[in-house]
Swiss-Prot record:
Species: Kluyveromyces lactis (strain ATCC 8585 / CBS 2359 / DSM 70799 / NBRC 1267 / NRRL Y-1140 / WM37) (Yeast)
Main location: mitochondrion
Residues noted as binding Mg(2+) in the record, renumbered to the chain: 236, 262, 266
Keywords assigned: Magnesium, Manganese, Metal-binding, Mitochondrion, NAD, Oxidoreductase, Transit peptide, Tricarboxylic acid cycle
Binding site for substrate: 118, 128, 149, 236
PANTHER family: DECARBOXYLATING DEHYDROGENASES-ISOCITRATE, ISOPROPYLMALATE, TARTRATE, ISOCITRATE DEHYDROGENASE [NAD] SUBUNIT ALPHA, MITOCHONDRIAL
Gene (UniProt): IDH2
Cofactors demanded by this protein: Mg(2+); Mn(2+)
Domain of life, source organism: Eukaryota
Catalytic activity field: D-threo-isocitrate + NAD(+) = 2-oxoglutarate + CO2 + NADH
Record-stated family: Belongs to the isocitrate and isopropylmalate dehydrogenases family.
GO molecular function, one term: magnesium ion binding
UniProt-recorded name of the protein: Isocitrate dehydrogenase [NAD] subunit 2, mitochondrial
Residues marked Critical for catalysis (site): 156, 203
Amino acid sequence: MFRQSIVKQSCRFLATKKQPSIGRYTGKPNPKTGKYTVSFIEGDGVGPEISKSVKAIFSAAKVPIEWESCDVSPIFVNGLTTIPDPAVASINKNLIALKGPLATPIGKGHRSLNLTLRKTFGLFANVRPAKSIEGYKTTYENVNLVLIRENTEGEYSGIEHVVAPGVVQSIKLITQDASERVIRYAFEYARAVDRSKVLVVHKSTIQRLADGLFVDVAKKLSSEYPDIELQTELLDNTVLKTVQHPEAYDDVVVVCPNLYGDILSDLNSGLSAGSLGLTPSANIGHTVSIFEAVHGSAPDIAGQNKANPTALLLSSVMMLNHMGLTEHADKIEKAVLTTIASDAKNRTGDLGGSASTSSFTDAVIERL
């Protein structure tokens, strides 16, 4: 009960202002303006609308940031989807980006743009916090989960082929190097946010070599972190326990291979908020990091002033914390969460309210 009361009182999506020692932001402000430059990928569908909301709120909060528009419309190089050189140069120069939802074009040869971004910039860790919002009632209360997903390999390696008519083989790639960097990041993250356990979620009873390697790497690394307890758990057990008793994981940083993390993180979002429209996300690399809303581009409501900008706003809060701009992060996060908790008229339709994108934005600005 004591821990639950602490969870409920705290509004922060990141439990501390400290950041892991791996993947730290090293960008510097413009010496003339005192502002940092951030690449902004507005995205597709509702992306431009929710991006406009973020820009308005950042302006009202006087955040020392200049946005650099970044077009990642896919191009083909040697038959494969890639990102235009100016976009790559912008993100490599600024070391940080905020990204709205992207739609992957349909057709042979097109690869997910999200996957392309992760590969291009070596974004090895996907950090997904999922936390209840005080004052906004959902089925579960006091959810406070953190999941770190390996972001570059596993079943998402894109290695599959037709063996024979009606038979397809898809290869799950697990490497020691990729496993070590994401697990090490999980330990460092646990230290930074004052969580005492790292939980490796796996299925090594079936995937003895692939998941077995992932678990073995974690066990070897754990000796370097005597202050953090290493635990391991089968995927199906984690799913069951998370649904039954999510509070059991409120002192834990979960880390897992790519596919498991993709599924578990959406489950966590459903438990904490009932909607991906409230879920922030960070993609961390050694030098570059990209923060993104995890929901889709929602073309069915694009241009109708109905989209919920909260996920992108909270992702921008994670970005500000990552940059060390914690006072601005706190101010915006508090304004967003108190707006959602205030009244149904200030919530967008996906949260059972009547607010438009623009009226929600105005309500947040009023609370800054």
